[in-house]
C-alpha cells in the first residue's frame, strides 16, 4: 500500500502523518491488518529495537473519588465492587513496589484516586518516593495524583520523582461528555506543570467509549502537540456499576489499528500498552508488541491483569526482550533534549511526540480497573459515548458505529491482591 510506505518513510524521519493519513490507518480492512502492523513495526524497531519496558502500578489510595469520570470504577457514585482503602504507608508502598521490581519492572507508578493532592498528600507521597528509591537503586518513579496545584510538581521532583502522569483521555471537543467535575484544560495545565518542573511527562488516552475515528485522531494529535515523553493507550474496561458498563465497542483488530495509528503519529515516543489489553486484545496481545515498546506488568489499579510470568513469557515468545535497568528507554535525541531542559526541542522534527526526548519515563497510563491515572485513578480515556451521569449505552450523536466486540465480562475481574490487601501481588 502506498499509504503504508509513506507512513514508514515519515516515521523513520520522525515526521508526523497528516490527519487524513491517520484516519486512513483506522479505516484499513482486516485483510490489510498484518500489513499495517508490519509497517508500524518498522517504525517501532527503528527507535526502540525489540526492547519492551516493564512498568508496575502501586495504587496508593483506592476508590472514594469525588470526580465523576464515566469510565472509572473509582468515580463518584460507582457501584463497582472494587477495593477501597486510604493512603498506604510509605513502607507498605515500598514493599508493593519491590514485587514489581523483582519481576523485571524498571519503573514504578504511584497512583492515588482523587481530584488532586493536598500539600500534605504531596509530603506523604514524597516520603514514599524516597522509601522506594532507597530500597531499589536505579528504579524510576512516576507519580499520578490528579490535578496539580502550583509548586507541587517541583516538590515531587525534589523528592526524587522522575515522571508525572495525567492522561487527556479524549479530544477537547468531546471531553465534557465524560466528566463534568473538571475540564480538558485542567488536564493540559497539569501536564504542562509537570514538564515545567523537569518531570518527564506521561499522557495518553482511552479507546472504546464509543468515540469516532476523528475523536481518536484528534486526541492523539493533541498529545503530539503537548509532547509527553510517554503515551499510554488504554482500552476501556466496562466495569459493572459504572455508566459505561455496556460499552463493548472494541475488537482485537480495532485495538491494533489504534495502536498502529498512535505509533505513526508519535514515532519515537514511548507508546505503552496499558489497561484493558487482556480484555480486548486477548490472544492478539503478542502482535501489539510490534507496535508498542512498553507495558504494565501484572495487575492494574482496581482490576486484575495477566499473570506477571505470562507477560514475561509472551515477550520472550514473540522475540522481544525486557528492557534492562541500565538502558535509556527513548532514543538519544529525545533523552538529550530532556536532560537539556523541558523546552529543548529538535526543530527539524517539528513539535509534539516526535520531537522532544524522554528520560525514559513512561507514565502511569493504566486504568485501575476501568480507568487510567487521571484524577479518578482509572484509565485516562475519553468517551464521547455517554455523558458523565447518563445511563450506559446512550450514544453521542455523530459517533462512528463500530462493529461491536463480544461482551467478555468473564475477563473483567476486580483486583483482590497486592496493595491494600494481605495477599501477595501479581508480578
UniProtKB/Swiss-Prot annotation:
Which InterPro entries does the UniProt entry name for this protein?
A: Aldolase_TIM, BATS_dom, Biotin_synth/BioAB, Elp3/MiaA/NifB-like_rSAM, rSAM
**SMART domains linked:** BATS, Elp3
UniProt-annotated stretches for the region Disordered: 383-427
- A family per Pfam: BATS
Tell me the cofactors it needs. Answer: [4Fe-4S] cluster; [2Fe-2S] cluster
**Can you tell which superkingdom this protein's organism belongs to?**
Bacteria
Q: What is its EC number?
A: 2.8.1.6
> Which GO-annotated molecular functions does the record name?
2 iron, 2 sulfur cluster binding; 4 iron, 4 sulfur cluster binding; biotin synthase activity; iron ion binding
| Cofactor stoichiometry and binding remark | Binds 1 [4Fe-4S] cluster. The cluster is coordinated with 3 cysteines and an exchangeable S-adenosyl-L-methionine. Binds 1 [2Fe-2S] cluster. The cluster is coordinated with 3 cysteines and 1 arginine.
UniProt pathway annotation: Cofactor biosynthesis; biotin biosynthesis; biotin from 7,8-diaminononanoate: step 2/2
Which stretches make up the Radical SAM core domain? 47-277
Tell me, what is an example of a GO biological process annotation in this record?
Answer: biotin biosynthetic process
User: In which residues is [2Fe-2S] cluster bound?
Assistant: 109, 142, 202, 272
Catalytic activity as recorded in UniProt? (4R,5S)-dethiobiotin + (sulfur carrier)-SH + 2 reduced [2Fe-2S]-[ferredoxin] + 2 S-adenosyl-L-methionine = (sulfur carrier)-H + biotin + 2 5'-deoxyadenosine + 2 L-methionine + 2 oxidized [2Fe-2S]-[ferredoxin]
Name the keywords, alphabetized. Answer: 2Fe-2S, 4Fe-4S, Biotin biosynthesis, Iron, Iron-sulfur, Metal-binding, S-adenosyl-L-methionine, Transferase
Which annotated residues bind [4Fe-4S] cluster? Answer: 65, 69, 72
The protein's job, in short, is: Catalyzes the conversion of dethiobiotin (DTB) to biotin by the insertion of a sulfur atom into dethiobiotin via a radical-based mechanism.
Family that this chain belongs to? Belongs to the radical SAM superfamily. Biotin synthase family.
Q: How does it assemble?
A: Homodimer.
- Kindly provide the name given to this protein in its UniProt entry: Biotin synthase
Q: What is the lineage of its organism?
A: Bacteria, Bacillati, Actinomycetota, Actinomycetes, Kitasatosporales
